[in-house]
Amino acid sequence: MRYDLINLSTVMNPDPKLGGLSFFEGTRDIPFEIKRLYCIFKAEQETHRGFRAHKTSSQLLFCPYGSVQVLLDDGKKKEKILLDEPQKGLIIYPNTWRELTWLKDDSVLCVAVSEYYNPSENTQDYQEFLQYLEENK
């Protein structure tokens, strides 16, 4: 299974009313240059998304608000990762299937991506994913 859990840098303000700040810097804190960033928001609890694998791009997923469960699958083994703290980051490398489940209403999931958008670089069919893995051992 090709992934890394990382801690995003976090600074808490001495005044609790001002909250905290979590951040990362591309190529310093993550192993790729960021070419795209998107956020998924206003999703209801038990929303399921993802259902895909990327052939060439790596991604950093983090949940600045709420709770999202990520199911990772390398074709042989499955593992669940919980993103429920703003300083928790999950780097997913190419050829890893992912499924996302919102565990709380209005959770926000942000994704930093190593490549520009290219729909032909991912598969949304699990059987095609398994076949691609078999052909590219």
Which functions belong to the PLM regions below?
Residues 1-88, 105, 112, 118-127, ...:
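Non-catalytic, conserved peripheral segments adjacent to functional cores
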Residues 85-90, 95-102:
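Well-ordered alpha/beta subsegment
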